[in-house]
C-alpha cells in the first residue's frame, strides 16, 4: 500500500494535505486496483478526505461525482451528455448504482429524474440492482425514493437476496415497513433457503422476525 492510499484509508488528513500540497498530481493517480484516490476515499467512508481531494482535482467523471455527491458537477455532466446516466464504469457500476451505494440521495434522485433506470443491474452476472446497494448500506431515504419510482421491490440478485433480506438482517424497521407496504414478499428465500425472517432471527432482531413470520 502506497503512502497516499494509506493516508486516505486511515483518514490522516494533516499528513494527506501535506503530501498533496507537495505533489498535487497525486490526487489524479490511481491507487490499488486502479481506483482513483477520490473513489477510494468514498469506499472507505472518509468524507473529509474526499473533500480534501476534491480541492486538488480540476475535473472528475460522472461516477466520481455520483459517489462523492458533487451535485453541481453531476448535473453539468448529464446536461452535456445525457446518455452518461446509462454508462458503466470499469467496475461495472452505473452512476445511479454508486449514488445509491454511497447514500447520495440528491444525486440519485437527479439521475432517476434524468432517465436512469432504477432496475438497471450492475454489469456482470451478479444481478445486483441499485435498491440492493441502497438497502445493504441502510440508506432508507434512497430506498424510499426508488420505491416511489416503481422499482422492482422483490428483485433478487444471484444469491437470491431481496431488499427485504437486507432490511431484516440489519434490523431496520422503517425500511422493512416501507418495503412491505410496497409489496415485498416475506416468503422469498435466498438460494440456500434463508428467508428474511431467518436473517432477522439469526441477527438478534426478534421483533422483526416475528413480523415476518
Predicted feature locations:
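N-terminal segments that cap or nucleate solenoid repeat domains
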Residues: 1-32, 70-87
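Alpha-helical adaptor scaffolds
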Residues: 119-148
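Ankyrin-repeat and related helical/solenoid repeat scaffolds used for protein-protein interactions
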Residues: 153-199
Amino acid at each position: 500500500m502506497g503512502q497516499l492510499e494509506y493516508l486516505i484509508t486511515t483518514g490522516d488528513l494533516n499528513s494527506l494535505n501535506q503530501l498533496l500540497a507537495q505533489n498535487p498530481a497525486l490526487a489524479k493517480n490511481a491507487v490499488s486496483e486502479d481506483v482513483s484516490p477520490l473513489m477510494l476515499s468514498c469506499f472507505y467512508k472518509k468524507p473529509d478526505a474526499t473533500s480534501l481531494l476534491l480541492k486538488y482535482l480540476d475535473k472528475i467523471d460522472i461516477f466520481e461525482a455520483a459517489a462523492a455527491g458533487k451535485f453541481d458537477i453531476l448535473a453539468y455532466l448529464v446536461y452535456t451528455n445525457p446518455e452518461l446516466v446509462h454508462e458503466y464504469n470499469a467496475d461495472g457500476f452505473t452512476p445511479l448504482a454508486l449514488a445509491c451505494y454511497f447514500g447520495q440521495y440528491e444525486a440519485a434522485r437527479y439521475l432517476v429524474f434524468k432517465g436512469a433506470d432504477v432496475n438497471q443491474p450492475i454489469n456482470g452476472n451478479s444481478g445486483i440492482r441499485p435498491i440492493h446497494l441502497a438497502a445493504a448500506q441502510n440508506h432508507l431515504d434512497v430506498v424510499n425514493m426508488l420505491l416511489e419510482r416503481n422499482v422492482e421491490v422483490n428483485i433478487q440478485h444471484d444469491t437470491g437476496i431481496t431488499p427485504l433480506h437486507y432490511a431484516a438482517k440489519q434490523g431496520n424497521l422503517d425500511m422493512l415497513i416501507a418495503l412491505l407496504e410496497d409489496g415485498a414478499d416475506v416468503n422469498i428465500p435466498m438460494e440456500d433457503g434463508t428467508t428474511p425472517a431467518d436473517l432477522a432471527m439469526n441477527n438478534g432482531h426478534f421483533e422483526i422476525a416475528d413480523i415476518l413470520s
